[in-house]
């Protein structure tokens, strides 16, 4: 009997040693991972954030986002599944003319599995006193069976077709062949905090071809992809991340595409 007790005690001690050792190894691995994140320079963190954002593209079926989780922080209430906010627009300004933009914002509520937004036409112009005059029109839209449709009557048939045929850049943009070595001009301001980076694109890139074709953009220069963000580099529901594809930006003309995919806390009562 004493012999059996000694064996049982020995086995208990052995298992305890193995368990403690295993926990120690897990902690060591966690420490190594944390240390890696800490030792990453801000430049590397911004590059990774850039690549992670572009990895979301394309979202061919927007309704897939109802089942996709995003980065959550302390701003989310318990039980809130959050919402995806998509924005895409083309902004242009030519010498002697006003700044114009046409685009869309779409909010996909993961709690209610509904998506609503607006097609927005904006025009900004300076008057003789150099005050900026803003003219904005919004046309409410919703997403049904992965199709965007106006929720109110649009009397202008051309505008109605324009809204119905509009595609967010996130629906067709594709960056699977992204080479992080080509990310340049990285900057970080810890006081704001905000950050930015650039990526060189060739004029024959498929994204560029699609944008030119969809919006009748005439430019033979190699565009650049600008990545901008504010808040925590890892993610922040109170900050933002957006991409800009800049075709031209000079005294004569400025043409660019702005696009963003953000995950935010839901608006209103998400338990309805």
UniProtKB/Swiss-Prot annotation:
Keywords: Cell membrane, Lipoprotein, Membrane, Palmitate, Signal. One of its GO terms (cellular component) is plasma membrane. A lipid is attached at residue 23 (S-diacylglycerol cysteine). A lipid is attached at residue 23 (N-palmitoyl cysteine). Pfam families: DUF576 (PF04507). Disulfide bonds: none annotated. Transmembrane segments: none annotated. Residues 1-22 form the signal peptide. It is found in: Cell membrane. InterPro entries: Csa, Csa_sf. It is a lipid-anchor. Belongs to the staphylococcal tandem lipoprotein family. This is Uncharacterized lipoprotein SAR0445.
